[in-house]
């Protein structure tokens, strides 16, 4: 039951974080490209690398906390479904170049940021 509580609490925090972070990014950069979704997914990619690597090396992160942070918080923060929908809408609007850039940049950047999170965790 403790694990479920961690997931629920951190999930709510992750959802709220996505709402505010993506909204802020859209205010800064506009909506010509799905910048808000891109930003939350990059942050999530970095955090999953950091959390998973750190939790494997340290007893400071309990299994329940790790699950709460990754499944709960990062599950609420990141969004593959919105990424898919926004990319589909770009394709539907004839924006093949922007849609392709979104797929390429999102996947490659998230992989790089996951790796950076792992590097940072190893340095801690």
From Swiss-Prot:
Summarize where Na(+) binds, as residue positions.
Answer: 75, 78
Q: How does it sit in the membrane?
A: Multi-pass membrane protein
Task: Output one GO BP term.
Answer: cellular detoxification of fluoride
Activity regulation summary: Na(+) is not transported, but it plays an essential structural role and its presence is essential for fluoride channel function.
Q: Which UniProt keywords apply?
A: Cell inner membrane, Cell membrane, Ion channel, Ion transport, Membrane, Metal-binding, Sodium, Transmembrane, Transmembrane helix, Transport
Keyword Cell inner membrane carried by entry:
yes
**TM segment ranges:** 4-24, 32-52, 67-87, 101-121
Q: Where does it reside?
A: Cell inner membrane
The reaction(s) catalysed by this protein are:
fluoride(in) = fluoride(out)
Checking InterPro entries in the record gives:
FluC (IPR003691)
**What are the recorded GO MF terms, alphabetically?**
fluoride channel activity; metal ion binding
The cellular component terms of Gene Ontology attached to this UniProt record, alphabetical and capped at eight, are: plasma membrane
Its family remark reads: Belongs to the fluoride channel Fluc/FEX (TC 1.A.43) family.
Per its database record, what is this protein's job?
Fluoride-specific ion channel. Important for reducing fluoride concentration in the cell, thus reducing its toxicity.
Q: Identify the NCBIfam families for this entry.
A: crcB (TIGR00494)
Q: What is this protein called?
A: Fluoride-specific ion channel FluC
The organism encoding this protein is: Geotalea uraniireducens (strain Rf4)
Q: What is the lineage of its organism?
A: Bacteria, Pseudomonadati, Thermodesulfobacteriota, Desulfuromonadia, Geobacterales
């Amino acid at each position: 039951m403790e694990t479920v509580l961690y997931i629920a609490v951190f999930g709510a925090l992750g959802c709220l974080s996505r709402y505010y972070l993506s909204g802020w990014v859209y205010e800064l950069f506009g909506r010509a490209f799905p910048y808000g979704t891109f930003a939350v997914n990059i942050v999530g990619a970095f955090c999953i690398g950091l959390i998973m690597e750190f939790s494997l090396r340290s007893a400071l992160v309990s299994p329940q906390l790790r699950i709460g942070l990754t499944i709960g918080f990062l599950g609420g923060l990141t969004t593959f479904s919105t990424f898919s929908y926004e990319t589909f809408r770009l394709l539907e609007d004839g924006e093949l170049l922007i849609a392709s850039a979104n797929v390429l940049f999102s996947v490659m950047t998230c992989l790089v940021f996951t790796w950076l999170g792992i590097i940072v965790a190893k340095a801690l």
